[in-house]
Amino acid sequence: LAWTGLRALSVHRDQRTWGERLLADLATDDPSFLVYVSLAARQSKYIVNQWLPALDALPRNGLVVVREANQLAPLAPTRHPVVYAPTTRHVEGLTLPGVRVAFYLAYGERNATLLRDPRLRHVMLAHGDSDKATSASALIRAFDETWVAGPAAIDRFRTAGIDLGPERFAVIGRPQVAGLPVGPSGREPRVLLYAPTFEGYYEATTHSSLDVLGVELVRRVLAGHPELRVWFRPHPASGVVRPSMLAAIAEIEGMLRAAGDGNLVVADRGLTMTECLAGADVLVSDVSSVISDYLATERPVIVCDPAGLTPDAFVAAYPSQASSYLLGPDLAGLDTILQQVLGDDPLREARIAMKKHVLGDPPGGPQAAFAANLDRLCESDVRGPS
């Protein structure tokens, strides 16, 4: 439990007094929502932390309920109490009378512990927008509502045959990217950010270019494009499935450290993903939410296709990449693509249109839409057990 002392909430007989006192303390904040965290080891670092600033900016108070102890240390600071609740009884004790909404950030197996509570409104926020298969899971049917960044996410569900009614969706934009700069930075030399995605746990989510073309990409940019500086930021979970990812990371980091002169291993500087996106003039990434978030800047995007699909097949499979420059596994056309993105950028207008489709355009901005939709659910009729 990270309430004040990293102790586990307990209502067992020998600790009942302490547990009741803790619940009373939590109730004084009058929380109206909770964030339910059940993830694979240490995923809170990149799944939960990206939502904490938006959650902290909400006018309403909430709780962060963590099911696994290994998620606690990676959590960033938050104004909301963080409660370690390892058992079903602990979770049940935290559905305080004023709590009306439960937010979920991933499709964890242990979500069912809370989903069965009929009094709450269960809302999937997810942890990013992309054309990955996991972004259109049939598990979405378990939730009362899904709050998405933009219309592209709703289209994605329908294409996958998951045609829920419009009342099951709310478009709130992406609060995480509301503060990113828009348009060219005007800085020289310009920065190319290479941010490959996670390799995925199964075939349908194998999108990472890191161990396919990443090393050669960085080598060629360093050797042939002195007008650029390369920043490297691999997905934090890289190497969990494929050890070859770790070898690629080590080789790229070695090249960048040797090159110096503004070329950067992001981990050496401790930059956040938001800082990386703000500092980049060009993004090279894979099918992932990183590209969706970077659309907020309206700057050029190069998407890697490690599978080597034809351009038509790639866009058919990943529609939100229609406004990205496509780079195949053999890096064919790399110099031409870089000339385009650093020059007249012929995909700029298509990218600006895609930005609205992917990230939405809610009145008042994403944070206001986030807060307004929470108010809507909190002020709706209380549901009782059915």
Predicted regions span which residues?
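Catalytic binding pocket for nucleotide-activated donors in carbohydrate/polymer assembly enzymes
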Residues: 289-358
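Active-site and donor-binding regions of nucleotide-sugar-utilizing enzymes
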Residues: 36-177
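C-terminal amphipathic helix plus adjacent low-complexity
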Residues: 336-386
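Conserved catalytic-core segment of nucleotide-activated headgroup transferases in glycan assembly
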Residues: 42-57, 177-254, 359-368, 386
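Donor nucleotide-activated moiety binding/catalytic core segment of transferases
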Residues: 245-292
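Non-catalytic membrane-proximal stalk/linker segments that position and tether the catalytic domains
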Residues: 1-32, 385-386
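A nucleotide-sugar donor-handling region in carbohydrate enzymes
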Residues: 3-18, 142-212
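Short acidic-hydrophobic, aromatic-tinged amphipathic segments that line or gate anion-handling sites
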Residues: 81-87, 172-173, 264-268, 322-340
